[in-house]
Amino acid sequence: MKALILVGGFGTRLRPLTLTLPKPLVEFGNRPMILHQVESLAAAGVTDIVLAVNYRPDVMVAALKKYEEQYNVRIEFSVESEPLGTAGPLKLAEKILGKDDSPFFVLNSDIICDYPFKQLAEFHKKHGDEGTIVVTKVDEPSKYGVVVHKPNHPSRIDRFVEKPVEFVGNRINAGIYILNPSVLKRIELRPTSIEQETFPAICSDGQLHSFDLEGFWMDVGQPKDFLTGTCLYLTSLAKRNSKLLAPNSEPYVYGGNVMVDPSAKIGKNCRIGPNVVIGPNVVVGDGVRLQRCVLLENSKVKDHAWIKSTIVGWNSSVGKWARLENVTVLGDDVTIADEVYVNGGSILPHKSIKQNIDVPAIIM
């Protein structure tokens, strides 16, 4: 089987982290974000994976080629000379995606969930039509494009309603699809949208179905959602009693859902959790309080610091008695001085912060 991952461009929504690494390589749950998808695709029997990229492809190639042997897959890069939207990349990769009659998966690289690739392939084969979209239920459908089904048919899609004022349904496009190669004939090699152009055309021919996603789902393309997605991911691991989580018997674990890389060092009298990820070679001092946060590789948190709803970037340092909260994001190599308060700052790489940031701000 084949798959195309829409990696896309600059990852501006996840800055300042994406100023250092392309978004798919930013660690989510202590692994590059895209590796969660590659691993799940390989487990479902996918052998050919195409990454559609238009930003720093050289970095992506160097980072991901080593995983081919590990997962027994071929990873190829389809490099766009100009951004081609969400449908154009399929046409650009037509030689691979259309090389045989078997269907192929398409997914957005920002999506973290319990990937249902095997079940999705079985469902798609069973109905025999041209395409299947994975959908997820949301509490506030008025914020999204909603999938509406044909009367008396539970899966065949009738139409899409963008940000409906009146309730028409609560299922939204989850950014994961399986399509027959015939779909490629519907797409031109130009910047084009699969959601706004390709899917409505398949829909009008009665050839598009939906597949309900069970379990958690999150688009983690911006810091607030990255943190929420981390909580959902850790909760999912806890339900499966995953060995990736620190046991609750550890003296520093407070409230559960804590992931700690084996190379990290944690001081005395710390309270960590719930929903914390601590990366490789991180050093946490004594008496530190961490909750709902991510500490990326080589970062350092000094004694008695208090951190909540924050992403601490690679090689960054948080001073003694400092307090960070309210979706604060530190880029690479940021230094927060002792006793400094940061209330929602987005701080670009290599900055040194010696004064309080009382209201959310971008520090350049």
Curated annotation (Swiss-Prot):
Pfam families: GMPPB_C, NTP_transferase. Signal peptide: none annotated. Gene3D superfamilies: Hexapeptide repeat proteins, Spore Coat Polysaccharide Biosynthesis Protein SpsA, Chain A. InterPro entries: GMPPB_C, GMPPB_N, Hexapep_transf_CS, Mannose-1P_guanyltransferase, NTP_transferase_dom, Nucleotide-diphossugar_trans. It is found in: Cytoplasm. It catalyses: alpha-D-mannose 1-phosphate + GTP + H(+) = GDP-alpha-D-mannose + diphosphate. CDD domains: LbH_M1P_guanylylT_C, M1P_guanylylT_B_like_N. Pathway: Nucleotide-sugar biosynthesis; GDP-alpha-D-mannose biosynthesis; GDP-alpha-D-mannose from alpha-D-mannose 1-phosphate (GTP route): step 1/1. GO terms for biological process: GDP-mannose biosynthetic process; protein glycosylation; spore wall biogenesis. One of its GO terms (molecular function) is mannose-1-phosphate guanylyltransferase (GTP) activity. It comes from the Eukaryota. GO terms for cellular component: cytoplasm. The keyword Nucleotidyltransferase applies. Keywords: Cell cycle, Cytoplasm, GTP-binding, Nucleotide-binding, Nucleotidyltransferase, Transferase. It is an enzyme of class 2 (transferase). Its EC number is 2.7.7.13. The keyword Nucleotidyltransferase applies. Belongs to the transferase hexapeptide repeat family. Involved in cell wall synthesis where it is required for glycosylation. Involved in cell cycle progression through cell-size checkpoint. This is Mannose-1-phosphate guanyltransferase.
